[in-house]
Amino acid sequence: MAENDVDNELLDYEEDEVETAAGGDGSEAPAKKDVKGSYVSIHSSGFRDFLLKPELLRAIVDCGFEHPSEVQHECIPQAILGMDVLCQAKSGMGKTAVFVLATLQQLEPVTGQVSVLVMCHTRELAFQISKEYERFSKYMPNVKVAVFFGGLSIKKDEEVLKKNCPHIVVGTPGRILALARNKSLNLKHIKHFILDECDKMLEQLDMRRDVQEIFRMTPHEKQVMMFSATLSKEIRPVCRKFMQDPMEIFVDDETKLTLHGLQQYYVKLKDNEKNRKLFDLLDVLEFNQVVIFVKSVQRCIALAQLLVEQNFPAIAIHRGMPQEERLSRYQQFKDFQRRILVATNLFGRGMDIERVNIAFNYDMPEDSDTYLHRVARAGRFGTKGLAITFVSDENDAKILNDVQDRFEVNISELPDEIDISSYIEQTR
């Protein structure tokens, strides 16, 4: 497959666009030490109870983890035994750490052999997952990790596989398939096959075909794990076809949106009143970092520019910019160089920035799933957060009602004053 074809396919995958960009990620990164609050867990047991390698426990301590989240408590003991796992849990509960820790625990690195394959539907998420592997394998110097996705030269990927073959490969299906077809990537030694945000990949037929073709290139005997924040009853049988008697964990079913500590409000206004209201709110609200979601690339660029003109430290991320630029901006925001991010849905799914405590739906998301993934950017890791949605027409109101009905949550009108302690961790 030509490189351009791969890139175009990936663009099709990544943005189910509605005149816009869409689709952003799905991985849950662990909280770092300087973050206020840690995973809220009903389990008092620590990670030591999982009998993990000492090197992994040291890295976990460095990341500031204390107790496993509910999904980690449920999944890790079985996952490290090599069982197939199908897991749905709400955003911000540490699903990524489940498969990262489980695969690193079982990994016995063999020079020149790829043992672990992790696939996800966007480049940004692939990049983030590879960083999680690097973070947790900090004290495992023999473990090599590589990430492959479209938008960057396939020749460089081929070089890496030839000269410095990784044990763990993370990537998007289009690029992984291209590398496997041209024999650069050998999948005959895969022992662990993981799909993150699996519903996004398996619902789209072209992407599902790629995943199936890649799956057939791997050995019959292997561990398969799939994770997502949203897993409809229709897609679950599709997932099971890849697995042998999987352990199924649905930590919270899709009927409830109980994002711990997240305050949700809406504001009714006309489209031309949005900027003034946004500026007013940014002036009065206390925030660490903010993500503002818009529906198109044009609106993303214009709003970010307007914010900068009003002296707000804003940066934009959208699918219209080159891949290197997107990753560079993502890193700038993650490193706290900018405090306000304007983004299309590309950023909406699972991208983890621990300091974000406010998410704005400047434009209403197109459905309730997208709403869940967007607002989950605030209040991750059991910390507090605030989600504010602008409602400017009947269609917006209908989607907001759908969200409330589906997730059995009451989203009320934004009051004149909000108690700061309800959406930001107070320093002691």
From Swiss-Prot:
Protein name: Spliceosome RNA helicase DDX39B
Acidic residues bias spans: 1-19
Gene Ontology cellular component list: cytoplasm; nuclear speck; spliceosomal complex; transcription export complex; U4 snRNP; U6 snRNP
Keywords: Acetylation, ATP-binding, Cytoplasm, Helicase, Hydrolase, Isopeptide bond, mRNA processing, mRNA splicing, mRNA transport, Nucleotide-binding, Nucleus, Phosphoprotein, RNA-binding, Spliceosome, Transport, Ubl conjugation
SUPFAM superfamilies referenced in this protein's UniProt entry, alphabetically: P-loop containing nucleoside triphosphate hydrolases
Source species of the chain: Canis lupus familiaris (Dog)
Gene this protein is translated from: DDX39B
Any GO BP: spliceosomal complex assembly
Residue sites binding ATP per the record: 89-96
